[in-house]
Amino acid sequence: MTDHRHHPVPILIETDLCDDVDDAGALAVAHALADEDRVRILGIGINTSGHWSHSAARVLNGYYGRPELPVGILHPTTDAIGPEDYARAISRMHPSAATPDRMPPAVDVLRAALADADDGSVTLVSIGYFGNLVALLDSPADASAPLAGRELVRAKVARTVVMGGVFGRRARPERGAEPVSETNFVHDVGQTARFLGEWPGSIDFVGWETAADVITGRTLPLTQGDDSPVAIAYALHSGKGTGRPSWDLLAVMLSASELEGHIAWSEPGTVAVDDIARTLWTASADGDHRYAKVVSSAEQVADIIDDHLGRPPRQPVGSISASVSEVEAWS
């Protein structure tokens, strides 16, 4: 395992924090890695427009003792909620974090964080949709950075980890397989295609199949307590003690070069999408893309991720102002 205790990896996280609870789990894992000095979280971009997602990120940051972390959101903002509404529910646990008066555009947060980072140092983790990242590429120079977006990314981002797509046998139409779509790719096909085709540098992908059997979060009520916002999010989304596949959590773990010996990488190649967002993979020696493959058991990988997901905050800030029963009653 790579030792980052003296050189934590600077990471920027792009998340939807809305439709599926693995986004909340991924932020929890990122904070646990930060507590170990494996990573240093520079900021968070919300790539959906519902302001409850923004406030939920702030609740989680505060719960883990980092209320100062900048959080941006896709503009214009809305009152939209996800189908299970966990973001609004955990926001109401901490009303001071739920006020929508501090919601800068995500592109501004991303640009400022990159501008302040050392050249070639940042790992960008995308666990949602691609609108903010495409907007970042298109962004002009401004007061935070003299470089336009594409040049800023090229100068500052050393590595990009993306949860998205479906790989392996299903992504090889030349071998007779029928390609399939995946949620993050299908959300906006045009933006997905632009991101895949225009993003500077290499991209490491965590495909749907990589983590579909890696179930985590079942023990959160025991490891963090019933009133943890992470445990509540999982209970509201999937049911208490049920757990959820670890798509986004696995991407965050790989951003810190964790899971050594449990994950292997494909040959290099190029990822694209067709007009209905089905994943198209072309192996190529000079390609900038590759995808992760689990080479140990799903249970072993889940145990390692659960160890991080279930860790209580090292230095929590403030108190939670509602119990799990009250939050469930609101939902």
Set out the residue ranges of the language-model regions.
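N-terminal acidic, glycine/proline-rich low-complexity segments
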Residues: 1-331
